């Protein structure tokens, strides 16, 4: 091969020019190739977002994978993610069917369950046919020797009536200077209103426990009973009840914060403000609760840090929440616990967006092992110390392996995709996720808290928005006690029917006696 310096000057210059042009072209191709890869990545991310939105709109709501995505992960311990991928890519006709699951034997039906014993029994006796009431031989009446009995659950339509309240007035002719004595006004939710306490309570229970909005209730009242009521009159009565309940909820919040463990979450609520024509302001209900116990909703007009900072001021203990930044730096005495359900949700969405990718189902299967440990603890009734010991033995090694696997996955995948986001979120929350391995009272996730949000979200779909900013704290007070009573298995009508009329005259320093937990302990026969 002739060296370049051996060529004539003119030829050498031409070759050098061609080499320079070729280098420029190669550089251009490299830049274009990088640009195409970047655009492909953008398209892939946008495609993921579109698929995720479609899935959220039209897909199933439960976080379950299809059998095709999970069967091979559980077929046997030695099955690897690569084998899952290869199996998924094979033509459908060539795929090896997963091992059949054994059918569960059908449980023996115990028979019809009896209706609740506490319900009133109204007997309806059906007589025999007259021809069967007399003896065919002698004609004498045949005595009743028993009954063929069965029970049905009956009901009566709601009955409305007008209560005429007459307070006695007494005077004396022989001693006129005694004046006239009048019976005192009994305590009421709305002292001078035309709605009885039991009517207000019924509307409240239907709206906030059964999610039946006021306008539907009033429409049914007008159609079925011919009673027309102004909606504002009724909603004002509900807000009056909410205002009365606020001190009780403040006392319940004090009970909650005296503990060492609080779960926190937030959800949106539209608020009418009049500031923007045709648009509502987005307010927030912040939930503070304990698993299986007290629930306190705090209304705020925004999602900023000020809300949780004010509520949790002075609290010392563990706060379990998601990765929202507003929860950070709430105080030096607060330990933050993470939520594994939020981590799981990211990998679930990644699995739905890329059904052939074996990595998300693999991670979900590992997370499932952690939840299986929690189910064992729940089913066997372990206390906090016993549950912590079980977690150390069973869950600790799984968590260590899970973190190592997430780190390895993150190094293998490009940035920006849903799987990348899921890995980054999990690893960013890892120190908080491990808190449940250090305290047996802390749950593996925030699902108790999220569960309390669901009734509120369902009700919000029916009553649409709050009528004003001032209504927010009152509705929050009602929702707090409704959800707390549900968790405590406390009869809401009995509880509110007892405390609401008394609250107007109840001493402020004794409000703590009316919280659901205290009231339940004092009224065990009513529950």
Question: Model-derived features: where do they sit?
Answer:
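Short, flexible loop/hinge motifs at secondary-structure junctions
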Residues: 1-191, 263-264, 270, 321, ...
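Short, positively charged, Gly/Tyr-enriched micro-motifs
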Residues: 5, 15, 19, 142, ...
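Mobile genetic element proteins and their domesticated derivatives, centered on retroelements
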Residues: 59, 133-135, 172, 203, ...
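Gly/Pro-rich turn-and-neighbor structural signature
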Residues: 73, 116, 132-139, 210, ...
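Short helix/loop capping segments that flank catalytic or ligand/cofactor-binding pockets
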Residues: 143-146, 180-183, 271-273, 296-298, ...
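Structured ligand/cofactor/substrate-binding pocket environments in proteins
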Residues: 197-201, 209-212, 297-330, 472-479
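Conserved beta-strand -> loop -> alpha-helix junction used to position metal-binding or nucleic-acid-contacting
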Residues: 261-262, 323, 332-365
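Acidic/histidine-rich catalytic cores and adjacent linkers
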Residues: 316, 324-326, 362-527
